[in-house]
Amino acid sequence: MMVLGHDENGHMMLASLPTSKDHVPSDMDIKSGCIDLPDRQVNVFVFQAGENVTTLQNGLSSFSFDVNTFIYGSDLDTYPTATFQSQIKDKITEIVLIGKISDTIFNSLKECLKNSKMVKNKFKRIL
């Protein structure tokens, strides 16, 4: 799960589950970064396989996805922060920090989603 932001009260978090499912039109080259085609109803941010996406910190090594990985603007959703924290406390959900996404990539991802017609306005306000 990739957390993209929180509402102004911190009660809801905006997140997306990165996927290896490729729904990019077959006539397009898949390149790293933003693909936004409003006339074809496509908004996706692509992480190419093997591309380092994290910054090194606190003993964590660099991280890259093994396969091309996608975050689709249409797949964003909000989740109650309190529920998520409760699940962690009660050991229902386990969090494994694999790294901190680089600021450059994270900002590009947020701009890609924020500028898309495919992303709901309520989500854009959080971004």
Please tell me what each predicted stretch does.
Residues 3-127:
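Conserved functional hotspots at enzyme active or ligand-binding sites that engage polyanionic ligands
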